[in-house]
Amino acid sequence: MKKVGFISLGCPKNLVDSEVMMGHLKQNGYQITADAADADTVVVNTCGFIDSAKKESIDTILEAAQLKTNGQAKRLIVAGCLVERYRDELKAEIPEVDAFIGTNQINDILAVADPKVNTRSLPVVPIGNQSATYLYDESTPRVLATPSHYAFVKIAEGCDRPCAFCFIPQMRGHFRSRRFGSIIAEAHQLAEEGVKELILVAQDSSRYGEDLGKQDALARLLRELSHVDGIEWVRVMYTYPTHISDAFLDVLAAEPKAVKYLDMPLQHASQNVLKLMKRGGNRQSLEQLIERVRRRVPGIAVRTTFISGFPGETEDDFEELMSFIKSVEFDRVGVFTYSDEEGTPAFDLSDKIQHRTATRRRNALMKEQAKISRRKNKARVGDVVRVLFEGESNESELLWQGRMETQAPDIDGCVLINDVPEGIVPAVGDLVNVKITEGHEYDLIGHISSHG
């Protein structure tokens, strides 16, 4: 049996693309392995978002190329966002690669995977992502790469936002939504496979359905998914601040299975920087938005990300962002130093910030957020919270772990469980009640008080 090794880098949206490619291959008789050294064909699905991601992608491709040079692998395929940005350069610099698949060519994996197919006969599909049409649907095969109790569901592809720092529109094409019925059908299929948590992802989730002429489509979708038998939690990631509707918030407040969690990258709070970023808004408008979110959805956890060191960011801009973080007290925050990406409007801006300054600002922001997170977590001591049980902890075989609804996998903390009543060890994916006994910077610790 032909064996394909998959290496998927980058975000959950890219992971879904990998799952689809693996699904096509498995459906056509290929064996899938996570061990590239044991494969006939190696597929590296790359990320091309920022410098660190590009470097990781290049290093991974070179490691895979060495497998081919050593005779362990017969074919090397490179896919994903890096291909959209640097296909010609990759082709020239890494001749070991047999085929390149862009983000609009996911279904072409079968045409290039077979080591018996002559490399010279492989199809060449030109890049043209402004006319990109690719969307998977409920009939598309997938091999889930996540733990069995949760799955990412891509509800849209592409982005039309003009953010000055971002190359994603050029890599992923224009914004386009999946059909409502297709997403619902896929949710039912995933529930039948034992998935308990659906995590809705897109480059711009809050715009879902606009291109289909549907109003409040995300709210309607979230409500419908919350009624799928077998699904316990539905989570929405990657929303945009100007598209947080009252209808969407009301569903979060009313539907028990719609988790009270809002992932909403804000990027900055200074009007000066937001204008340079081509995002608009100011601190006051963002504070009003957060106040509205918390008022309409009591108990909601708000997660956001910021960029430090954007060109033109002054010390006053930085101090305003710091003050904003202190004032709002987000539940989760990620801060990234600005990455100067060729081909973006920000690349041509003057007043570039030195990397050490951007790093200093990032570290200061994260240090302040750590204090906020620790204080909020300590305030939960004594609470009994609903936790999705995820099995043995990654930190110690003496601990179990799970997540509250306010914790997304991989990017947020977890609940470490140090005591399970005798005879009632839950199954992975079960919901259990955990009494919190300790609160730390990112994680909480507790014991199971009841199961079921």
Regions found by a protein language model. Name each.
Residues I7, A79, V201-Q203, M237-T239, ...:
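Generic beta-strand/beta-sheet core signal
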Residues G48-F49, R172-G173, L212-Q215, K275-G281, ...:
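Short glycine-enriched, charge-decorated loop/helix-capping segments at active-site entrances
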Residues L76-G80, R85, E192-D316, K326:
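Conserved SAM/AdoMet-binding glycine-rich loop
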Residues C163, I183, L200, V236, ...:
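Conserved, mostly hydrophobic/aromatic
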Residues K196, E232-M237, K260-L262, I300, ...:
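Structural beta-strand/beta-sheet cores of well-ordered domains, especially the beta-sheet scaffolds
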Residues K260-Y261, L274-K275, L286, P298-A301, ...:
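Extended hydrophobic-aromatic, low-complexity segments
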Residues D348-G452:
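Terminal RNA-binding accessory module
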